[in-house]
């Protein structure tokens, strides 16, 4: 670049900074100065800032877009007062459930913050273990969707008896693998910045410990339960956290090959204490400056966590109907009550609670909501209701210990083929119709079903995770109608 162009761009960047700062409160400006000081110390002094590379991994949520804006303000503030500022790597993980709203939110944030075309900034997207330039318009590849579906099923079928189906196992494993590899790619980064609280850091590490055990690659080494040791833990696990499920020829390597050999040591910089104020105070920055738009079905589910309550309630409804011999409506309504109680405990704004009730309890019948959830799950993962029900039963692990119960409950006509099913899962010859039925009902190829057949379930997770549910049960949340319960503090 020539000097005139550099001067022009520096002027543009300073204008962006001034507009960004105009949305900051006094407390946020103080937090910005503390963030700058923290980065200077981590880099080893202002004179080394130009060589320092920082990574963030936004997901398109309100919190991630807000923290990116704060970090960009720090980068541009340092650029205005020092010879050089830090380099920034912005990397996002693309998965089947990565909705267009989240990608569009990130794109609008990147554009508003002038991250595109800034040579100090890398904008990356990882899909199916391939590092690509960020592109919010790129469709999800078929290979990526197929791999994600298979990983989700394999992790889900490794649940302990009586353990509820949750999204966190596969999501946690995928994100951990992503963090470890994207931090090493192309000469690596010096620091990863994240705003998770100590409680959420501990929860992630605990979830990761259980997830790697489900994936068949052992347990984590003893650790402090914080992100300070996360990269050391990930280095010890290796780059392929799903290798316990697949043969060497079936595994997909990280690409571009040879780009993940960096020995640069990545440290964690905790910025959870930099998020000051509340959502109402941040909303002008999010909506007017960053162009953030929330999808109608996204509700706040606690500290920095976002989920689709319709899908979660749908799965609980299926569990009630097929596993617990209750009605779908009872399981669905009970879970909505639990989510609402959790939101109240987290002091989520009243209008948000009321919005969830209106979305899930009044305007549509339960059958309409069930159809909407089933349609989304099929479009997103390519799995029909019968395949989700199969996953709820986990009939294949432990040498098919739960297979007969599954057949009696859902497919009594296949009981006559029970011996053939066991032989097929043992890798022996079986009737073609039986093999095809196994694939149709599970969504998995027979060879992977056979792999599950030889695996043991993990022990139950323990009583800790059930503490909240026990407390909610004691409070009388017994699955009564959503619309019958007022939202009171």
Indicate residue ranges for each PLM-predicted region.
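Nucleotide-activated chemistry modules centered on ATP-dependent adenylation/adenylyltransferase
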Residues: 1-51, 87-111, 117-489
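A phosphate-binding catalytic loop at a beta-strand-loop-alpha-helix junction
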Residues: 46-80, 286
